[in-house]
């Protein structure tokens, strides 16, 4: 199992607007061979204690910070579950704090974790933590490593003790689209999205391409709410899509909870995002695109325990991964999913894992009829990082 190591970045203005910042990357696809044997550690132990009782000086203390609640059925829950996957790992303890805003408060939390809890590897997971908060603390604590979820690290500009990680979750969205393509009766899908940034557009497009690989006439109606967490607008958007005849809905917002619950109340199918939301829609939940941060956090811990750091270049500063690397996964299929849908999805999943499936193939057009993919683009193609179009079959406009 290998993880992609990128060596560039960019400047972003909106929270979690990750992909736009990778436009200037000069070497996509350089492969780190450090990340091998990525089998998550999931043995149960007490959450904030090491698995055994080794000498305190040998314990690796890892700190995790979330902008929202740990149980939001979304972005923050996915990171919390990744942290929980470290339980049982020898000589590792974890400390975490939820509900920390993207203000100087996160600096105080990081400083407390470093000074009082002796944390030496910090994982502040929200986009807005990076600049200026992580950068300021990193300069003050050069021996502490700061790992940020995003693509913001720039070589030569940012401190050596800062790194970034992210993943190709659009691969899981493509598979979810295949399931949706099998299950829709109307041929109309819906997508509730926060903002038309490249990462969001890539999820919309990959979901649509997966569905249209089953039925080329399928359409995806998209509604942008304008921000990452607007529950009222998310409910309104979902209801509006149902009123327009869609019978499967998915989303890209911080917490899919409202979208999934609204879909269940309206009696349509839903597909999740970030984490598993099946408990919110026992009848209509088909599957979902999930993060598997346990893989990432476990391997970071193993590398650090082996003496590798960002500072000695033992750990790449910018890391990416998808199905093959264990960064993303698909939620378990819901009871409504047909055997044919499962078979098609599993086949595509296997091809993503072995690298034989190309989502963005030569000749793809946007929804205005313009060819936007002149040649096959693999997942690391720099052209996909600046995506500013909606694929053919998507009904909607980028404001």
Residue ranges and their predicted role:
Residues 8-12, 34-62:
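C-terminal segment of N-terminal export signals and the immediately downstream linker at the start
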Residues 1-38:
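N-terminal secretory signal peptides
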Residues 49-399:
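A residue-level marker of the well-folded mature domains of exported/periplasmic proteins
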């Amino acid at each position: 199992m290998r993880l992609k190591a990128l060596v560039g970045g960019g400047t972003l203005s909106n929270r979690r607007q990750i992909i736009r910042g990778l436009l200037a990357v000069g070497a996509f696809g350089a492969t780190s061979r450090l990340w091998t044997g990525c089998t998550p550690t999931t043995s149960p132990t007490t959450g904030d204690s090491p698995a055994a009782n080794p000498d305190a000086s040998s314990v690796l203390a890892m700190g995790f910070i979330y902008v929202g609640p740990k149980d939001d059925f979304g972005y923050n829950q996915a990171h919390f579950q990744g942290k929980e996957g470290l339980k049982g790992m020898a000589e590792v303890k974890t400390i975490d704090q939820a509900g920390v805003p993207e203000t100087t408060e996160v600096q105080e939390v990081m400083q407390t974790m470093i000074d009082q809890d002796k944390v030496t590897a910090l994982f502040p997971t929200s986009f807005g933590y990076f600049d200026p908060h992580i950068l300021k603390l990193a300069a003050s604590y050069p021996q502490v490593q700061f790992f940020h979820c995003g693509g913001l690290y720039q070589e030569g500009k940012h401190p050596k003790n800062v790194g970034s990680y992210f993943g190709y979750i659009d691969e899981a969205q493509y598979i979810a689209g295949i399931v949706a393509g099998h299950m829709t009766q109307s041929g109309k899908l819906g997508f509730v999205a926060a903002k038309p940034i490249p990462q969001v557009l890539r999820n919309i497009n990959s979901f649509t391409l997966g569905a249209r690989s089953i039925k080329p006439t399928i359409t995806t109606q998209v509604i942008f709410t304008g921000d990452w967490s607007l529950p009222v607008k998310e409910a309104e958007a979902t209801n509006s899509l149902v009123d327009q005849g869609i019978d499967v809905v998915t989303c890209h917002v911080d917490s899919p909870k409202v979208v999934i619950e609204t879909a269940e109340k309206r009696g349509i199918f839903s597909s999740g995002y970030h984490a598993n939301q099946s408990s919110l829609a026992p009848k209509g939940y088909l599957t979902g695109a999930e993060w598997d941060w346990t893989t990432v956090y476990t391997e970071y811990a193993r590398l650090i325990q082996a003496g590798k750091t960002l500072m000695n270049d033992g750990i790449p500063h910018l890391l990416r991964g998808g199905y093959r690397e264990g960064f993303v996964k698909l939620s378990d299929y819901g009871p409504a999913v047909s055997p044919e849908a499962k078979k098609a999805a599993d086949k595509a999943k296997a091809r993503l894992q072995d690298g034989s499936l190309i989502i963005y193939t030569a000749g793809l057009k946007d929804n205005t009829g313009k060819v936007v993919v002149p040649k096959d683009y693999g997942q690391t193609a720099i052209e996909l990082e600046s995506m500013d179009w909606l694929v053919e079959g998507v009904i909607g406009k980028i404001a």
